C-alpha cells in the first residue's frame, strides 16, 4: 500500500508543476559542421566556439524563447548534435532516440533529410510513446507531430529562409506554457515578411502551414497549428492545434511514467490496486481541471476493449464472461486503461490509452 501512497504524492507534484514544465521545453538541433559533437546547452554562453558562424546563429535562435506578460521564457535546454559531410542524418536520429526533447529541428536540412526526420518522428511516437515533435520547413507531413513552417523572414536587414528560422520557431513553441497558444505570438526581431492577402493566408493555414502575419503593429504567428490536414474519427480538429497536442502529450507522459516507475515496480498488479491507480489518475486530472487545462468532465477506467483482446490472446472464452469478470480478470504484468477527457478550448473529446 505504501507504493500507492507514493503514487498519489508523485501525481500531486506533477499536476502542480504541469504549467511550469510545459514552458521549459527542450529544443534539439541537428547541425552540419566540420566536426562531430553532441552537447547539451543551458545558455548561449555554452555554445562551442569551434562551430561555424551560421551554426552559432541557429543555436542563439534556439534560446530566444517566448514572452509572457513581458517576462522572457526560454527553453530549459538546447541540445545540439552535429555531423560532417561524411555523416548521415540517420546516425544522428539513432543517437537522439535515447535523448529526451520536445522539438527537433534541422536548419539546413535537404528534402531527403526532412523526409527521414518525419518518418523517424512518427516511428518513435508510435513505438516509444514519446512526446517528441519536429519543426521543419516546407514539408507537407500531414501529421500532428510535425510543424510545417513556410515563412521566409527579414531580421537585421538579412533575409532568412524558413528552414534556417525553424530553430527560432521551435524555441517559441517549447517556451510557451500550455495555458497559452502561440497564435498571435509576436516575433519582435522580424522586420518584414512577404505580404499576402487574408484569403491566401487562410488557405495556407487550412493546408497545415505555420505562417506569419502582420497584426496590431507586429509580425505574429497567424495560427498555432501543425501540419495535420487529414481528419479522422480518432484525430479530429483538436489534433491540429500545437497547444492541445502538447498538453495531451505531457498528460500521457506523466501517467505512463508514474505507471512504469512507481506502480509496476512496487505494487502487485491486482484488480484492487488497478482501481487505486485509477483513483490516483483521477486526482491528477482533477488538479489539471482546476488549472483550466482540461474540462472537469473526464473519465478514467479499465480499457475493456484492450482487456478483451489480451484475454482472447490467452485463449480465454471472453464471450462467456460478464463485464465485471472481464474488468477484474488477471492480466499478468499488463495494465490497460482508457482515459476520456476534453482539452480546454476544444469542442471534442479525446481518448488516451495507457497500455503497459
Curated annotation (Swiss-Prot):
Subcellular location: Virion; Host cytoplasm
Principal location listed in the UniProt entry: virion
GO cellular component: host cell cytoplasm; virus tail, sheath
Keywords (A to Z) from UniProt: Host cytoplasm, Viral contractile tail ejection system, Viral genome ejection through host cell envelope, Viral penetration into host cytoplasm, Viral tail protein, Viral tail sheath protein, Virion, Virus entry into host cell
InterPro entries reported for this sequence: Phage_sheath_subtilisin (IPR035089), Tail_sheath_C (IPR020287)
Family matches, as Pfam families: Phage_sheath_1, Phage_sheath_1C
GO biological process: symbiont genome ejection through host cell envelope, contractile tail mechanism
Similarity field: Belongs to the myoviridae tail sheath protein family.
Binding partners and assembly: Homomultimer.
Protein's job: Polymerizes as an extended structure around the baseplate-tail tube complex. During ejection, the sheath shifts to a contracted form, thereby making the inner tail tube protrude through the host cell envelope.
Annotated protein name in UniProt: Tail sheath protein
